[in-house]
Amino acid sequence: MLCSHVAASQSLAELEKQLDSLLRKEEKSEVVLGVGYGNNPAYGSKTTNFELPIILKTFVSPSLSYYHKSGFYAGVSAYYLFNSLNKPWFEWDLTAGYDYTKNKNFLTGISYTHYEFTDSSDVPTTPITNELFAYFYYRKWWVQPGVSLDYGWGKDALEGNHTKETFRGNDFNFIAALRHPFIFNAVMSRRDVVLFTPSVNFTMGTANYYSNLKAFQYVTRSPKLKQVKKHPGKELNFEDHSNFEARAIDVTLNLSYFIGRLNLAPSFTVFKPFSGTEQNIMSYFTARMAYSF
C-alpha cells in the first residue's frame, strides 16, 4: 500500500479561492507559476516485473495555470522523477475546471484532467488517462462537511506482430470529509496570511489500477491480469475489476502561507488503509510553492 502523488486534500486553486472568499478579497484573474514536491510509486529495478517491489521516488512538478475571475481555470503540469532508470519526465497533465466560491455558505467545483504518460519503465503503467473530479463543501457550520466524487477512465493498446491487446479500465471513488479552516493575519509581517486547514477524510471506491486520480492517496497493486494466450490475427480486449469498498481514513494537515504574490503550501497526511496487504498506519508529506502574476 503506497501513496500516490496526487492527493485528495485541497488543491492550491481551492485553497487560494477559499482564502480569497473568506477574506472577501477583490476578485481578479491570475496566472500562477508553481512547483510541487512529493513521492511517486516507481519500480526499484531496471527490469519491469509484477514481482518487483514498488518503492517511492522523489519527484518535482512544475506547473503553469490561469485562473479567471469568473471561476474558470486551465493549467498544465509535468513530473520529473529523481533517480529514474529511464525517462525522468514521466508524466504531463492538462486540466480545465470551474470553482464556485461566491456563496458564503458553500464551495463547489468540477474539473477534467487528461494524463499523458511517457514510455518510462520506472512507473507502473495504467490505462487511466482521463479524470472527472467534483467537490462540495458546506461552510456555514464551524466544522465543514464535504463530499468529493472522482471518476477515471481510459484504455491502453499494445500492438505486437500478430496481436493487439487493449486494456480498458475505470475507477470511481467517493470521499466524505470534515474540516475547519483557521485564518491568521499578520503572522510574520503586516502583509502575510496563514491558512491552516485540518481535515478528516473517509475514502470509498475501487482500486483497479495504479492511477493519479485526485482520490488516490492510497495505491495498492491491483490483481494481476490473467495470462492470455496469443493467437495470430486476434484482437484481445480485457478489463480488471475490484469491488467498491472502504479504502482508507486519513487525517490531513494543510498549511498555506501567503505573503504578497507568493504562496508556500506544505501538507502532511496520516492514513489507515482498510484494503490491500499492508494495513498499518502510514504517512507522507508533500509541498508546493507558487507565485501569481
Predicted regions and their residues:
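Surface-exposed strand-loop-strand hairpins of Gram-negative outer-membrane beta-barrel proteins
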Residues: 39-60, 76-84, 239-243
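Transmembrane beta-strands of outer-membrane beta-barrel proteins
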Residues: 32-38, 65, 75-79, 109-113, ...
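Outer-membrane beta-barrel biogenesis signature
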Residues: 9-34, 43-51, 189-191
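Membrane-embedded beta-strands of outer-membrane beta-barrel proteins
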Residues: 62, 94-96, 132-134, 176-178, ...
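Outer-membrane beta-barrel "beta-signal"
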Residues: 280-293
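Short loop/turn motifs that connect adjacent beta-strands in outer-membrane beta-barrel proteins
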Residues: 20-30, 101-108, 137-145, 182-197, ...
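Outer-membrane beta-barrel transmembrane domain signature
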Residues: 150-265, 269-275, 291-293
